Amino acid sequence: MAIRLGINPITWSNDDLPSLGGDTTVETILSETWAAGFAGTEMSFKFPKTSRELGPLLKRHRLELVSAWYDGRIHERDIEAEWAAILPHMTLLRDLGCAYVVYADTSLRSEGDLFAPISRRPKLADGEWASYGKRLTALAERMAEFGVRMAFHHHMGTIVETDQEVDRLMAATGPAVGLLYDTGHSIFSGGDPVALLKRHVGRVVHVHCKDARKDLLVGARATDEGFMQAVL
């Protein structure tokens, strides 16, 4: 099976902190993506938000849309409310031929929390995992019926951050919940990305290949820096 690689535009311009790469144009991002040998790109906050505009733009640069991040809130919302909120995003992805949506649950987090100390990020209580898994599975099944599958992104600063939390998530959810396996976030959270992949390779539907500079990571954890502060 041939493997085609895409890249995230955050390499050029940061969605969470627009001042990082804020002056980099969409044309620069897309032309350099193609020049670097990538076949596709994930979404940027700078890209058009309609398939009518984004489709021709990507085609002009000989690229495809791989997927796009969504700030999920299924822990806080019921399924109907979450589905109504995500439907425009899902429609864009389906219109442009994407197979998966990058779904990260940012429940219990407010603006600026990415700068909060790592130790203060939100967590699920032990008794919440079973009901959370059922609700997430039901949402993922609806996504699959719509034509775009869920790729759940474990991410620093969210309720599913550590390898152990990924384990609990996979145990509490059905097969409709695919895993976005992210090496960098596993490392940052103190995990073992190789062992994590071995345990859940059958659920992986999307991959983010990232690294982490050990000296900066050790320093960030020692001083309890926030995720974005560590990035800076």
Region spans (language model):
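Active-site acidic/histidine proton-transfer and metal-coordination neighborhood
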Residues: I79-Y181
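Short, well-structured secondary-structure segments
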Residues: A39-F45, E64-W69, V101-Y103, A151
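Acidic (Asp/Glu)-rich catalytic clusters
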Residues: M1-A2, L30-A35, P48-S67, A84-A99, ...
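Active-site mouth loops of central-metabolism enzymes
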Residues: N8-T25, S44, D71-W83, R121-A130
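Active-site beta-loop-alpha junctions enriched in small/polar residues
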Residues: I10-W12, S44-K46, Y70-H75, T106-L108, ...
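Structural motif corresponding to alpha-helix initiation and N-cap regions
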Residues: D23-E27, P48-R52, E76-L87, D163, ...
